[in-house]
């Protein structure tokens, strides 16, 4: 039987990291894009491990040397998606998955588009980051019952509504055991860089505590999964 060929959208992007690489990138992406050796959040990493990880990211083309040669620069298309992880106002939904088999390539369709997950053959396991347009994410979260359908959720048109709705942001990161093709963990972003596009009616006094708690959850979850596999 001839295998069906699936054409993926040219706009779809995917990035595969080891746990150490992702931890390094997340630690380096707050409001800045430069990666150096004195990065907040990396105090527990040995300098040799940081250097080795940076070399790996350079080889993958995910970071570049700056012109002055003193630091490294995360490529713009990747930095834009990673920056949402370093912002204060992120809410995450954690889904622990066991024994869930995935094909070598999975096609996710949103409004006629395809987004892909492709485990990296060169890693025993790795992190896969999947992105989608904001309008697609809104639809998915509303379908999951995680965002209201009513008028309390409004897409803010700051410049051009069509452009704003198509702006891409981080949707999901997965930790994949690439040898067995099993998803060993997943973090789903309920709200990320949509902050500048979404407006909620009313105020929640507990909002800041919730954001801080959720951000600690993702940090603890990533550290637990990374340390368990001996990558940090």
Annotate each language-model stretch with its function.
Residues 2-23, 31-39, 64, 71-232:
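Non-catalytic recognition/regulatory regions in large multidomain proteins
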Residues 27-46, 54:
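Short acidic, hydrophobic short linear motifs in intrinsically disordered regions
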Residues 46-50, 133:
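Short amphipathic alpha-helical segments
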Residues 49-61:
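Basic amphipathic alpha-helical segments that dock to polyanions
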């Amino acid at each position: 039987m001839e295998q069906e060929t699936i054409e993926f959208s040219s706009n779809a992007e995917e990035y595969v990291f080891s746990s150490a690489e992702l931890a390094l990138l997340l630690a380096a992406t707050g409001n800045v894009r430069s990666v150096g050796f004195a990065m907040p959040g990396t105090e527990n990493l040995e300098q040799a491990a940081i250097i080795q990880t940076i070399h790996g990211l350079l080889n993958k083309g995910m970071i570049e040397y700056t012109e002055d040669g003193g630091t490294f620069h995360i490529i713009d298309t990747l930095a834009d998606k990673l920056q949402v992880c370093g912002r204060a106002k992120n809410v995450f939904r954690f889904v622990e998955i066991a024994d869930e088999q995935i094909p070598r390539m999975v096609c996710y369709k949103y409004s006629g588009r395809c987004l892909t997950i492709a485990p990296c053959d060169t890693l025993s396991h790795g992190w896969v980051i999947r992105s989608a347009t904001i309008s697609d994410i809104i639809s998915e979260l509303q379908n999951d019952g995680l965002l209201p359908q009513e008028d309390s959720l409004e897409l803010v048109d700051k410049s051009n509504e069509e452009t704003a709705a198509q702006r891409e942001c981080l949707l999901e990161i997965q930790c994949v055991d690439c040898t067995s093709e099993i998803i060993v963990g997943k973090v789903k972003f309920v709200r990320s860089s949509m902050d500048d596009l979404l407006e909620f009616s009313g105020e929640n006094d507990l909002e800041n505590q919730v954001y801080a708690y959720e951000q600690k959850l993702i940090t603890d979850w990533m550290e637990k999964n990374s340390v368990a596999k001996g990558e940090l």
